């Protein structure tokens, strides 16, 4: 796929007009539009630059930036991460992807180890389902979803003095063994 005329965020921390070539869901080449003109002047055809059977998107007036990572969210679209079903986690991830977020680290609240374990179990099931769908590249469901890349354990290991919305009943000092048990789920 070729994305033409996009305003691309560069390593110089500014936007420049460029063409982006994508193969197998990976960016393989970014060509400043001036270079595209130089290729044309050098006698290179569109076929030399990208495959003809590849779709082309004109991104004139649009910006292309790296996918964003949401490192602290408690939910979205009416669903709370801690109480969501696996299907509701998918809805949260769909919403995030629709808004430019390609990866999420949802945050926990302060709960008992049992409840936190159930949260971890649902997150694991979502992650496995998401990974299998990506590997199969299923055409049945081509819905974009943010990848769950971790869990932000905001609670229960948080300061009682700065508890905010956390339930003080479950706030406790850091417990490495409890964390490991939750991590292994």
What are these regions (language model features)?
Residues 4, 16, 28, 69, ...:
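A short, local hydrophobic-aromatic micro-motif
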Residues 85-88, 119-122, 175-177:
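Charged helix-capping and loop-helix junction motifs
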Residues 124-185:
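Metal-coordinating catalytic core of metallo-dependent amide/deamination hydrolases
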């Amino acid at each position: 796929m070729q994305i033409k005329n996009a305003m691309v965020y560069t390593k110089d921390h500014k936007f420049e007009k460029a063409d982006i070539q994508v193969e197998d869901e990976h960016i393989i080449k970014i060509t400043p539009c001036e270079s595209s003109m130089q290729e044309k002047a050098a006698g290179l055809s569109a076929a030399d630059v990208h495959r003809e059977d590849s779709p082309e998107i004109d991104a004139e007036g649009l910006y292309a930036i790296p996918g964003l990572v949401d490192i602290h969210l408690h939910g979205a679209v009416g669903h709370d991460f801690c109480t969501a079903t696996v299907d509701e986690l998918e809805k949260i991830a769909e919403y995030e992807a629709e808004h430019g977020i390609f990866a999420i680290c949802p945050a926990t609240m302060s709960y008992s180890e049992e409840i936190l374990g159930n949260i971890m179990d649902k997150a694991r099931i979502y992650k496995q389902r998401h990974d299998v769908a990506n590997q199969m590249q299923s055409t049945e469901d081509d819905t974009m979803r943010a990848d769950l890349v971790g869990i932000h354990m905001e609670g229960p290991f948080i300061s009682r003095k700065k508890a905010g919305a956390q339930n003080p009943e479950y706030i406790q000092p850091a417990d490495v063994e409890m964390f490991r048990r939750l991590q292994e789920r």
